[in-house]
């Protein structure tokens, strides 16, 4: 039953969908094919077809008929046979076939005898015609006759008849003898008809007469193609729009020959670059061929103040030109300028070269012009001139007699010593016929852009949509307005047609003719101001204002579109370019405390130009609407001004208020309406032409910094910004203050207009203007209306709850009200409509308020539904995320998988652009991208801060096709946005460095995932590991010497000096961050990790509350107390680095926690010298540790003192200390990752020094030397066998607590206050948990990530310190902290161990939460248990900022595993839930998990799962989370 019901609903839905689709299709078809209400209206193409008759189809021409049979017959050559073949055509004219039809005149004899001698053909009515309208027809009349053929034009609304002359245009040469007759009609603005008449009064006079192909050509306005007139040859002349022809040689010769100027318009803009150049828009590609040439682009206005000119013509020359000043006293004897590469010419008949040359003075030399063809051995000389000329321009025209194949023009001037002359070059043109023969086709492409003020159709209510005219700057910018050619190109294919003024105050002003009398809404947009060199966050916006004006047909509106003020950057020369890049601060340094200029000036932005719309009355301009321009920004942003500070825009509407220009100071004020200013840097008023001001003289003379104001009165800039143009110009600061912006101009609305939109500063670029036919909605109730697209009528708009009445004016509330309105206006004899009842919607107040039960039911159902959906969504998200992470961990766990996973992908990157290095902005485009195909990964080196680090090869980096060994840092594909930003920032930082003691960034590969950073391969590893590995020991001598240690210190000092000189603060100079090129004696130490610098520069502040790690033991007091980081911070860190080097890799401040180090350093304490440290070296350390940063030496001084040490025999001959601690294998073992992990959970080993601990939970060892901290593991099931590893070695004696004095009297190191290394009695179990950590380290290029988990929390610490004793048999307390302390992780055990001060050193008690008792397998002198230990596994996550947990793959095992069978005894305590790891006697198997220990910290912001409780003490790792310190953001 349900199935049948569903089928029914489906069929019903399909039926409804089909009906709706059919209805929509009918509506769309009706919309696409509208019904024309006037059948007489047709398109121009249809009119052209109607006026053409070839008699192959029905013809619209009317034929005379004086008899019932008719006088004209349509026939063909096959149908009409004659006895004489030469008296009839063998084919028609239109088709050229014998089957084609033509019109034959064959009057009857009775008609001729009646005296009717006239026969005619009349065209259909033509509404109007263009200037090239003409009649064309074909006639066949083989024998001369007395009959006469004529044509005339008759206007339909009058009796006037205008005869037109028929002339023979062409005649077929074959026997068909068809003649083509043509008569010019011309432009007619009234409807007319054309009549062709033949007069003959006898059959003999008629003879055989046939017509074909009657056509009115080019008579319909708007034809895309216009045939040439009869007096123009298509391929040898150009037809002007208004009639007449000019020769092709005169096209594009800088002389306007056509009345409308089309011969110098769009055609010339299509010519190749450099072939038509007046130098008004730039050099057009004409450049000096050598850098020593003196040719330069100038204008006549720029030469007015030049007193060294020899003549006056150049000063009076308008526009720009190339200028060469010849002065024979110098070494220069020639100058050369050449054009850009030009294409091949296609004709040599009408091709000619024309240019204007000026040469005046005592010139002992020659000026020559040559053509250099591509591939030619020598240039072809086409013109040469020497001698003396007058002080005037000479126009030179040269014919190009040969077809050139790819060439350029070259103008050379040679002179001898003693010459003194001025030479100028202007208006260079190769005629358009050189490159294109179809000039008329090029011209007709621009016909929609007629330059005359041809009236547009008057807007009416029947138009489909309001007409809009949009005016722009025509692509021009700067202080001068556009040209006619620019506006013609910009308004192409639009309805805008303007004439641009060329001279005087109207230069650059666009003139537009109002097409119809109506009310227009005019909107004006002022231009924005320019940006300052270092004040480019936000520009001053131009003002938008709109008003309505009544305009009459034929009115001329003058529109000046404002140009944006020029930005100060990029600079015009290398010095200003450096200032823009932030590499130079000469302007800030050259200003007084009050902000006034001392020497340097420039760098401000120019003022924006205003947009003026006005018209002429009695020869004087009358402003209608003025949108003010924005002021220019100063060189620097005012720190006291708010970024969001805004001012209320104002406007003036009183014409009696004078439109003065803004006040000018060091920068130029904005131009007003009718003011006059003599300052060149002030913006000109509109009556002066509205040109933008130039830069202040100081900026031009010192820095050559030219920053102009925009066209429209924008003021020129200095260090302060220029004022904006307007009705009243914006003021500029009186003093050249580097942070004083120019003010905006004042807008204006004429009282005759009505404000439509209040002014608003919103324009961010050049100005604009919009003119729209305004819809008058005053008759509507809501004062708002629109134009209906179907009826073309204006319809009033009603509110959402109202309906428009049939009168299209009134709004009725409901259908009931509408019905009442209709009945009210019905006639008396009409029956009223039955109105529907007034329906009140449910739930309204008519039904009363809803009940409380209903409200509660709705609320409860909503809440329940929301909770259910929320829970379901969260559950789904949780399981999906869990499964996804599990899959990702499995896939990305192996480094070999990443080796094979190279997949193409597009990089999407974002970074903070506000921070740069070495004064330069950081950009990803500066990184050297290496194609992925050139990179080969060889093997994995380790895991770094982001991902795996590989050794690889890259091709093509050294200029040869040889492979370069590199280290490759990778960023996993699946990572957070912060990791990606950190990765890119580290690449940007390292790419900026170029020094022999800083690891070099070879390149990057960011376009394909995973992303790579290619670094210099450092095979020697990090310095800390190298020093620890090469310590001299009792049975092992070291190859290191004191001189080699000094060389390593010198190498790092060289790198630090490079960073210091470039004002770069490293923030973490330490041995762990220094790498060695090789382990041999030729090693070079380099700085290789910029983790902290990356974190600082990646964000705009130092995150105090984040999880960033701070190297406390390497930081000076002002850094961790006040958050101040300077170059002196690195000096302090370098002192600690020296201590590390000469202690051979020990942790600074031994046995001190971070908090103790803070108190120790701030209290004035400093570390003692390492053992065997030479005195001069220790003095360098203490000088680096001066409390006052100013007293610390810079790295140049440090380098000098290190060099002195290298030359001191007492220093370099000092022997290195011999260590009697553990063998080297315990410090540098490799990590062995077993295949299986088991299911063990690591637990904390709670150790107590108390002798009165519970004997059931303790095991006493009789051999204190063998006591080791062990890892207690909890197993959910009993295991019978385990794989264990052991290494019987002695712990170092320097990390153990000593209960009695004198036990730890280090012979070469005295710790301040003689504090033992034991934990205080206040240390809690949670603190011990925090002190146990896991170190993850990339041996060569990685960063450190330290993390441990315990009871839902993690901690970051380190376990390295200095040895306190050299006695290998010293008693070791298991609760002590050594340099090789085993990691211990607490999972769910509650441990509370507080050893008393009197704990015996010879006995250790391990107290777990619960542990079953075990018997020693040996049962000998002590308890020796085979511990149950499994290897922890290191979880590898796909991102750099990850948490690392312990599992079976994180410990180092012995090469020979020992399988020990264990039997687990049941626990006698109900609380015993975990197994115990015991300690063994000497000779028994001792399982000691070994972990690589190196001092570092995690550069990434390591996130812990939960927030741990605040510990009382920290491990002596040297690092602390930033949230534990009071760090001021920097």
UniProtKB/Swiss-Prot annotation:
EC no. given is: 2.7.10.1
Topology check: give the Extracellular ranges. Answer: 26-851
Where found in the cell?
Answer: Cell membrane
Name any GO cellular component annotation.
Answer: plasma membrane
- According to the record, what happens upon gene knockout? Complete absence of iridophores. Fishes do not survive past 6 days post-fertilization (dpf), possibly because the swim bladder cannot fill with air.
Query: Topology: which residues are Cytoplasmic?
Result: 873-1530
Provide the disulphide bond pattern: 232-245, 240-258, 252-268, 474-487, 569-580, 696-718
- What is its membrane topology? Single-pass type I membrane protein
Q: Please provide the record's keywords in A-Z order.
A: ATP-binding, Cell membrane, Disulfide bond, Glycoprotein, Kinase, Membrane, Nucleotide-binding, Receptor, Signal, Transferase, Transmembrane, Transmembrane helix, Tyrosine-protein kinase
Q: How is its activity regulated?
A: Inhibited by ALK inhibitor TAE684.
Task: Give the matching InterPro entries.
Answer: ALK/LTK-like_GRD, ConA-like_dom_sf, Kinase-like_dom_sf, LDL_receptor-like_sf, LDLR_class-A_CS, LDrepeatLR_classA_rpt, MAM_dom, Prot_kinase_dom
Give any GO molecular function from the UniProt entry: transmembrane receptor protein tyrosine kinase activity
Could you name the active-site residues?
Answer: 1068
Q: Which residues form the LDL-receptor class A domain?
A: 231-269
Q: Where is the MAM domain?
A: 51-221, 275-436
- Which reaction is recorded as catalysed by this protein? L-tyrosyl-[protein] + ATP = O-phospho-L-tyrosyl-[protein] + ADP + H(+)
Positions of ATP binding = 941-949, 969
Q: Which residues are glycosylated?
A: 148, 364, 495, 653, 776, 808
User: Mind telling me which residue stretches traverse the membrane in this protein?
Assistant: 852-872
Q: Where is the composition biased (Polar residues)?
A: 1519-1530
Q: Which GO biological process annotations does it have?
A: cell surface receptor protein tyrosine kinase signaling pathway; developmental pigmentation; iridophore differentiation; maintenance of cell number; melanocyte differentiation; melanocyte migration; pigment cell development; pigmentation
Q: Give the signal peptide, or none.
A: 1-25
**Could you give the subunit structure recorded for this chain?**
Homodimer; homodimerizes upon binding to alkal ligands (alkal1, alkal2a or alkal2b).
The UniProt entry's sequence similarity note says: Belongs to the protein kinase superfamily. Tyr protein kinase family. Insulin receptor subfamily.
Please give the name of this protein: Tyrosine-protein kinase receptor
Q: Which organism is this protein's natural source?
A: Danio rerio (Zebrafish)
């Amino acid at each position: 039953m349900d199935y049948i019901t569903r089928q029914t609903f489906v069929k019903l839905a399909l039926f409804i969908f089909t009906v709706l689709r059919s209805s929509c299709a009918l509506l769309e078809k009706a919309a696409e094919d509208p019904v024309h209400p006037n059948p007489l209206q047709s398109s121009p193409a249809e009119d052209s077809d109607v006026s053409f008759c070839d008699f192959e189809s029905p013809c619209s021409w009317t034929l005379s008929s004086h008899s019932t049979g008719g006088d004209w017959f349509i026939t063909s050559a096959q149908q009409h046979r004659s006895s004489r073949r030469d008296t009839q055509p063998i084919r028609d004219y239109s088709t050229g076939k014998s089957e084609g039809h033509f019109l034959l005149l064959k009057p009857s004899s009775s008609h001729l005898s009646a005296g009717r001698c006239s026969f005619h053909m009349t065209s259909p009515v033509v509404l109007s015609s263009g200037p090239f309208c003409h009649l064309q027809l074909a006639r066949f009349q083989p024998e001369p006759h007395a009959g006469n053929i004529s044509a005339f034009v008759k206007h339909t609304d009058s009796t006037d008849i205008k005869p037109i002359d028929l002339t023979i245009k062409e005649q077929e040469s074959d026997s068909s003898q068809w003649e083509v007759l043509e008569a010019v009609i011309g432009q007619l603005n009234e409807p007319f008809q054309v009549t062709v008449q033949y007069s003959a009064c006898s059959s003999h006079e008629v003879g055989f007469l046939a017509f074909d192909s009657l056509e009115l050509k080019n008579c319909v306005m708007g034809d895309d193609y216009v045939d040439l007139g009869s007096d123009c040859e298509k391929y040898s002349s150009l037809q002007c729009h208004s009639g007449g022809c000019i020769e092709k040689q005169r096209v594009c010769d800088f002389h306007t020959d056509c009345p409308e100027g089309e011969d110098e318009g769009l055609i010339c803009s299509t010519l190749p670059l450099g072939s038509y150049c007046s130098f008004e828009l730039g050099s057009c590609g004409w450049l000096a061929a050598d850098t020593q040439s003196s040719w330069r682009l100038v204008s006549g206005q720029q030469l007015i103040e030049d007193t060294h000119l020899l003549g006056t013509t150049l000063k009076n020359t308008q526009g720009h030109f190339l200028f060469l000043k010849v002065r024979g006293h110098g070494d220069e004897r020639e100058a050369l300028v050449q054009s850009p590469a030009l294409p091949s010419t296609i004709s040599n008949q009408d091709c000619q070269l024309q240019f204007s040359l000026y040469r005046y003075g005592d010139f002992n030399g020659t000026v020559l012009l040559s053509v250099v063809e591509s591939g030619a051995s020598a240039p072809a000389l086409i013109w040469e001139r020497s001698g003396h000329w007058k002080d005037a321009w000479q126009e030179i025209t040269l014919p190009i007699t040969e077809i050139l194949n790819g060439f350029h023009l070259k103008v050379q001037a040679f002179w001898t010593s003693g010459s003194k002359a001025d030479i100028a070059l202007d208006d260079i043109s190769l005629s358009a016929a050189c490159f294109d023969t179809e000039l008329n086709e090029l011209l007709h492409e621009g016909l929609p852009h007629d330059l005359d003020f041809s009236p547009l159709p008057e807007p009416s209510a029947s138009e489909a949509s309001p007409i809009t005219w949009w005016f722009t700057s025509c692509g021009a910018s700067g202080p001068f307005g556009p040209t006619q050619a620019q506006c013609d190109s910009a308004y192409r294919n639009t309805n805008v047609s303007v004439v641009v003024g060329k001279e005087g105050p109207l230069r650059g002003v666009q003139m537009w003719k109002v097409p119809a009398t109506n009310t227009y809404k005019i909107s004006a947009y002022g231009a924005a101001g320019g940006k300052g060199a270092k004040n480019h966050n936000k520009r001053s916006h131009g003002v938008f204002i709109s008003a309505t004006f009544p305009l009459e047909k034929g009115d001329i509106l003058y529109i000046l579109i404002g140009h944006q003020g020029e930005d100060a950057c990029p600079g015009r020369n290398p010095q200003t370019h450096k200032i823009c890049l932030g590499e130079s601060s000469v302007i800030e340094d050259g200003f007084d405390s009050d902000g006034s200029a001392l020497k340097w000036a420039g760098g401000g932005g120019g003022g924006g130009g205003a947009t003026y719309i006005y018209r002429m009355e009695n020869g004087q301009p009358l402003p209608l609407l003025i949108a003010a321009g924005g002021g220019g920004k100063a060189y620097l942003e005012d720190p006291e001004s708010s970024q969001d500070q805004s001012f209320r825009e104002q406007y003036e509407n009183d014409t009696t208020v004078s439109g003065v220009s803004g006040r000018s100071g060091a920068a130029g004020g904005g131009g007003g309406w009718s003011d006059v200013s003599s300052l060149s840097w002030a913006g000109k008023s509109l009556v002066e032409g509205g040109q933008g001001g130039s830069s202040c003289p100081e900026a031009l003379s010192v820095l050559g910094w030219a920053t102009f104001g925009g066209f429209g009165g924008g003021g020129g800039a200095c260090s302060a910004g220029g004022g904006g143009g307007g009705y009243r110009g914006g003021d500029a600061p009186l003093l050249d203050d580097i942070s004083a912006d120019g003010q905006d101009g004042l807008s204006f609305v004429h009282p005759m207009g009505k404000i439509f939109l209040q002014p608003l500063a919103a324009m961010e670029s050049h100005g604009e203007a919009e003119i729209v036919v305004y819809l008058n909605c005053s008759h509507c109730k809501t004062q708002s209306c629109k134009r209906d697209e179907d009826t073309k009528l204006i319809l009033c708009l009603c509110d959402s709850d109202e309906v428009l009445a049939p009168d299209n004016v009134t709004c009725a509330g409901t259908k009931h009200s509408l019905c009442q309105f209709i009945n009210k206006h019905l006639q008396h004899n009409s029956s009223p409509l039955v109105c529907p009842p007034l329906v009140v919607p449910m739930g309204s107040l008519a039904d009363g308020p809803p009940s409380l039960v209903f409200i509660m039911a709705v609320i409860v159902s909503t809440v329940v539904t929301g909770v259910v959906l929320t829970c379901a969504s969260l559950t789904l998200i949780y399981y999906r995320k869990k499964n996804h992470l599990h899959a990702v961990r499995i896939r990305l766990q192996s480094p070999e998988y990443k080796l094979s996973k190279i997949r193409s992908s597009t990089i999407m990157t974002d970074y903070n652009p506000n921070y740069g290095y070495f004064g330069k902005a950081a950009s990803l485009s500066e990184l050297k991208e290496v194609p992925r195909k050139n990179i080969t990964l060889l093997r994995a080196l380790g895991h770094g801060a982001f991902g795996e680090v590989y050794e690889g090869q890259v091709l093509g980096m050294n200029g040869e096709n040889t492979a370069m060994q590199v280290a490759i840092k990778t960023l996993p594909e699946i990572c957070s946005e912060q990791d990606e930003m950190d990765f890119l920032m580290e690449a940007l930082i390292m790419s900026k460095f170029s020094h022999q003691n800083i690891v070099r960034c070879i390149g990057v590969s960011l376009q394909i995932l995973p992303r790579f950073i290619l670094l210099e391969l450092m095979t020697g590893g990090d310095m800390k590991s190298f020093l620890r590995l090469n310590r001299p020991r009792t049975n092992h001598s070291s190859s290191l010497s004191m001189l080699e240690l000094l060389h390593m210190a010198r190498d790092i000092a060289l790198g630090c000096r490079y960073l210091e000189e470039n004002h770069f603060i490293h923030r973490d100079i330490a041995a762990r961050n220094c790498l060695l090129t090789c382990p041999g004696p030729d090693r070079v130490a380099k700085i290789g990790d910029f983790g902290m610098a990356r974190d600082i520069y990646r964000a705009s502040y130092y995150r105090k509350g984040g999880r960033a790690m701070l190297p406390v033991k390497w930081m000076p007091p002002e850094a961790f107390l006040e958050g101040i980081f300077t170059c002196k911070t690195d000096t302090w860190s370098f002192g600690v680095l020296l201590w590390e080097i000469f202690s051979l890799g020990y942790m600074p401040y031994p046995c001190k926690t971070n908090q103790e180090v803070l108190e120790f350093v701030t209290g004035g304490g400093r570390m003692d010298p390492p053992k065997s440290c030479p005195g001069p070296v220790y003095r360098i350390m203490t000088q680096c540790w001066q409390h006052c940063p100013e007293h610390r030496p810079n790295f140049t001084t440090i380098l000098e003192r290190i060099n002195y040490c290298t030359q001191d025999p007492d220093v370099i001959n000092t022997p290195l200390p011999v260590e009697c601690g553990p063998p080297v294998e315990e410090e540098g073992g490799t990590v062995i990752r077993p295949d299986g992990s088991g299911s063990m959970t690591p637990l904390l080993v709670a150790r107590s020094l108390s002798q009165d601990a519970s004997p059931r939970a303790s095991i006493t060892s009789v051999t204190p030397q063998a006591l080791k901290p062990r890892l207690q593991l909890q197993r959910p099931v009993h295991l019978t066998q385990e794989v264990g590893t052991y290494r019987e070695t002695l712990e170092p004696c320097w990390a153990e607590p000593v209960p009695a004095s004198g036990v730890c009297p280090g012979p070469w190191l005295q710790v301040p206050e003689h504090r033992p290394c034991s934990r205080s009695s206040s240390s809690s179990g949670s603190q011990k948990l925090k002190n146990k950590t896991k170190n993850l380290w990339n041996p060569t290029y990685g960063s450190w990530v330290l993390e441990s988990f315990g009871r839902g929390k993690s901690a970051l610490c380190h376990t390295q310190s200095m040895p306190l004793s050299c006695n290998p048999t010293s008693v070791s307390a298991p609760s002590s902290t050594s340099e090789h302390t085993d990691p211990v992780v607490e999972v769910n055990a509650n441990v509370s161990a507080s050893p008393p001060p009197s704990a015996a050193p010879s006995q250790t008690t391990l107290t777990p939460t619960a542990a079953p008792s075990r018997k020693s397998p040996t049962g000998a002198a002590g308890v020796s248990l085979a511990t149950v230990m499994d290897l922890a596994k290191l979880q590898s996550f796909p991102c750099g900022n990850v948490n690392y947990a312990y599992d079976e793959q994180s410990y180092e095992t012995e090469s020979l595993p020992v399988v020990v069978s264990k039997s687990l005894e049941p626990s006698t305590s109900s609380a015993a839930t975990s197994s115990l790891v015991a300690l063994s006697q000497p000779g028994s198997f001792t399982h000691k998990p070994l972990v690589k220990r190196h001092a570092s910290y995690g550069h990434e912001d390591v996130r812990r799962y939960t927030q741990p409780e605040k510990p009382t003490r920290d491990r002596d790792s040297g690092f602390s989370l930033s949230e534990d310190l009071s760090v001021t953001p920097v």
